[in-house]
A protein has these predicted regions:
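S-adenosylmethionine
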Residues: 1-148
């Protein structure tokens, strides 16, 4: 059971009216979808999808964003992060919501980008991919221990 802190619950109840609030709590209880982002600098989304499906993974692509793929079937613990495809940088494990900022920015090869909240790096690597490893992309974070 998800436990919301009382202050947070009060705040959310002001935003989400009472008839809808139980639905919000129900949604919070659902497991998050396992989503990966294809690194198009190394492989096309079609080739990655085919490669992962050969391993028995059930993949669906996110409408309007072919680089984003949902892993539909249950995998072994750690399988998503330990696969050879992940280890060689063919995909990055990344929430769909995290992919939205770089998509909104639409950085190109000619741009200079300063990412001041870069750790752990999912949005930064996505921007590098979108910029085709060109332009200038500086990654920094206020918390030095988050940078690796």
């Amino acid at each position: 059971m998800l436990e919301l802190k009382p202050r947070f619950e009060e705040y959310i109840k002001k935003i989400i009216p009472e008839p809808e609030f139980p639905k919000f709590l129900e949604y919070c209880e659902k497991p998050t979808r396992r989503i990966i982002r294809c690194n198009t600098l190394k492989i096309s989304p079609e080739k990655l999808k085919a490669r992962l499906e050969k391993k028995g993974w059930e993949i669906s692509q996110v409408k309007g964003f072919p680089e984003a793929m949902v892993i539909e079937n249950k995998l072994l613990p750690g399988e998503l992060g330990k696969s050879i495809e992940h280890q060689t940088g063919l995909y990055y494990v990344q929430e769909l919501s995290s992919m939205m900022s770089p998509l909104a920015l639409q950085a190109t090869k000619e741009d200079y980008v300063l990412d001041l909240c870069a750790a752990p790096g999912s949005k930064t690597t996505q921007m590098a991919m979108m910029m085709e490893n060109s332009g200038l992309l500086i990654a920094n974070d206020v918390k030095i221990d988050r940078l690796r």
